[in-house]
A protein has these predicted regions:
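Helix-turn-helix
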Residues: 12, 16, 20-58
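Solvent-exposed, amphipathic alpha-helical segments
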Residues: 12, 16-24, 69-73, 106, ...
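Amphipathic alpha-helical packing segments from all-alpha helical-bundle domains
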Residues: 68-74, 98-108, 115-143, 154, ...
Length: 200
């Protein structure tokens, strides 16, 4: 009788794969390179992940999933500007952590990979849309009209995305931290003014 597969084995291997990629590009992923890094057989990787493309998709989806908790937590809370801003700050502070920095690089690389390989459909490019939708929905819950909410959401999300890219390539923690705080403060001031303005 064949031995039953260990259900914890695949998640553990996926976590180890992501850890191994902290100092390697996503484009370098091969079954052989990962097998050597994890000290497992290529057969074990094929057994758990299938094809090379399926492996890449699972890696990207694991990277994307780590951001979902912050969005879901804010959506389940009472709609206040401070709760929304705190969720934005929490997300940014998470991105600034030394252990998270390599994951930012991998997420950016994954999104760019999907630009030239849309058949992968791993969801990396969808993260940007997800953040835009979250920000827009949060502002609408506060009473901002849809068009202005969408504009403000995109302005902040694109600012923070740009700062993440800067952080990855420059490593200027203090400079990027100051700029992110400025972007969030300006966002807070604009939304506060919008909410205080009389309805037309």
């Amino acid at each position: 009788m064949p031995r039953r597969a260990d259900p914890a084995r695949k998640p553990a291997m996926l976590a180890a794969i992501i850890d191994a990629l902290r100092d390697r590009p996503l484009s370098s992923v091969t079954f052989r390179s990962l097998a050597d890094a994890l000290d497992v057989s290529t057969y074990a990787l094929v057994y758990h992940f299938g094809t090379h493309d399926e492996l890449v998709v699972e890696i990207v989806q694991a990277l994307v999933a780590r951001q979902e908790g912050i969005i879901d937590a804010e959506r389940s809370s009472s709609p206040t500007l401070e709760a929304h801003l705190e969720a934005v700050r929490e997300s940014w502070h998470g991105a600034m952590q030394p252990l998270t920095r390599p994951l930012l690089r991998l997420e950016l690389e994954a999104a760019l990979l999907e630009v030239v390989r849309p058949d992968l459909r791993a969801g990396a490019r969808d993260v940007h849309s997800r953040w835009l939708q979250w920000q827009t929905d949060s502002l609408m819950r506060l009473g901002v009209d849809r068009d202005r909410a969408a504009l403000e959401a995109r302005l902040l999300v694109d600012q923070l995305y740009g700062l993440q890219f800067d952080l990855v390539i420059s490593g200027d923690d203090s400079g990027i931290s100051a700029l992110s705080q400025r972007a969030i403060d300006d966002y807070r001031d604009r939304i506060t003014a919008l909410l205080a303005a009389p309805l037309a």
